[in-house]
């Protein structure tokens, strides 16, 4: 018998054994027999981290931010380098230190081409 966490496997064939209240546990695959008392005092300790359970609320918050940024985008007369459209939408973010300029993100409404520049 081999145990990995709360799962118990047959030592002969590796089949997963079913837990039972009977005196003996029998492997359904190879018919090996194990005394059930071996499994009675099995202690399982689990550990997890916050990253193992992603927050649905946090994910929703990120999606809302992206959508709100799209709504706040302004339009400028700038030629798209990809399709030649005369207008592009843009928004700015302060990604670098406060004493440096902001980053301008452009997006073409026609072909969805995106690029950014540092001011």
Swiss-Prot record:
GO terms for molecular function: DNA-directed RNA polymerase activity; nucleic acid binding; zinc ion binding. Keywords: DNA-directed RNA polymerase, Metal-binding, Nucleus, Transcription, Zinc, Zinc-finger. One of its GO terms (cellular component) is RNA polymerase I complex. InterPro entries: DNA-dir_RNA_pol-M_15_CS, Rpa12/Rpb9/Rpc10/TFS, Zn_ribbon_RPA12_C, Zn_ribbon_RPB9, Znf_TFIIS. DNA-dependent RNA polymerase catalyzes the transcription of DNA into RNA using the four ribonucleoside triphosphates as substrates. Component of RNA polymerase I which synthesizes ribosomal RNA precursors. Required for growth at higher temperatures. Component of the RNA polymerase I (Pol I) complex consisting of at least 13 subunits. This is DNA-directed RNA polymerase I subunit RPA12. It comes from Schizosaccharomyces pombe (strain 972 / ATCC 24843). The lineage of its organism: Eukaryota, Fungi, Dikarya, Ascomycota, Taphrinomycotina. The gene is rpa12.
């Amino acid at each position: 018998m081999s145990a990995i966490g709360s799962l118990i496997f047959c030592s002969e064939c590796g089949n997963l054994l079913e837990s039972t209240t009977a005196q003996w546990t029998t492997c359904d695959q190879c018919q090996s027999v194990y005394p059930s008392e071996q499994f009675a005092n099995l202690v399982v300790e689990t550990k997890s981290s916050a990253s193992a359970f992603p927050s649905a609320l946090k994910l929703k918050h990120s999606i809302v931010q992206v959508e709100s940024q799209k709504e706040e985008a302004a339009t400028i007369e700038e030629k798209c380098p990809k399709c030649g459209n005369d207008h592009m939408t843009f928004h700015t973010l302060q990604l670098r230190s406060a004493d440096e300029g902001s980053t301008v993100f452009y997006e073409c409404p026609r072909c969805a081409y995106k690029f950014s520049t540092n001011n």
